[in-house]
Amino acid sequence: MHSLKKLTFEDVAIDFTQEEWAMMDTSKRKLYRDVMLENISHLVSLGYQISKSYIILQLEQGKELWREGRVFLQDQNPNRESALKKTHMISMHPITRKDASTSMTMENSLILEDPFECNDSGEDCTRSSTITQCLLTHSGKKPYVSKQCGKSLRNLLSTEPHKQIHTKGKSYQCNLCEKAYTNCFHLRRHKMTHTGERPYACHLCRKAFTQCSHLRRHEKTHTGQRPYKCHQYGKVFIQSFNLQRHERTHLGKKCYECDKSGKAFSQSSGFRGNKIIHTGEKPHACLLCGKAFSLSSNLR
């Protein structure tokens, strides 16, 4: 095993052209900062020594007063063609908000005579994203987990395309838990689980609900109306859904299976509760103290 070389920030910098950087909105630039800091963190966890530079401090403080240029070859002498294959120039210079210059000079450039070589595969990596991806491939680490399905991902940048799998055709997305819906009505109804809002109240007992259908179902408990009956045991229910759920207990049928633990459930509520255990999601937050819970019953 080769000894792990000491790296600088420039060795792990993902590079963009000035035009690409200008086209990135605030969220994309934030994602870039997160990727850079995560790259550094993962390399340290793999045993690499990272020199802490001024640029890293800028990143940690959330500042964006610098730009990068794309890696390219600088060919000014045709006799040095073979040598230039090992020479890469990256512009890495601090700027001020008043700096609108688009020129790049040798004074503001960093020459890397040798690209990074992976100790496991021996592959030459000229881009920092390739460096980190290569190291994570050998280590087997997949540090990013999808909140929706629990799938582990190796690269932070790959989480964005993965999210689109879950949100495809669903243009209304919750900014708190990233759940997506096909229409704004369902999104507003979902947000009530975060805010605790319950606009539908029973006029008899004042119990409140997030949905009108839940209120109508509740009102039947006051009237005693139970139109759905189990033919095997004679048990009656307020809703047809409750009857169907009861009948599954006779059949021993468990339709909902967790792909993580293999545990099966006869009811979707039990399946959803089990799924939250794996993801660690706590979507129900107290408006007074901010404490969050995985189940709405714990919040109440």
From Swiss-Prot:
Residues 7-78 form the KRAB domain. Pfam families: KRAB, zf-C2H2. SUPFAM superfamilies: beta-beta-alpha zinc fingers, KRAB domain (Kruppel-associated box). It is found in: Nucleus. The keyword Transcription regulation applies. GO terms for molecular function: DNA-binding transcription factor activity, RNA polymerase II-specific; RNA polymerase II transcription regulatory region sequence-specific DNA binding; zinc ion binding. It comes from the Eukaryota. A zinc finger (C2H2-type) spans 172-194, 200-222, 228-250, 256-278. Its main location: nucleus. Gene3D superfamilies: 6.10.140.140, Classic Zinc Finger. One of its GO terms (biological process) is regulation of transcription by RNA polymerase II. GO terms for cellular component: nucleus. Keywords: DNA-binding, Metal-binding, Nucleus, Repeat, Transcription, Transcription regulation, Zinc, Zinc-finger. Belongs to the krueppel C2H2-type zinc-finger protein family. May be involved in transcriptional regulation. This is Putative zinc finger protein 705G. The gene is ZNF705G.
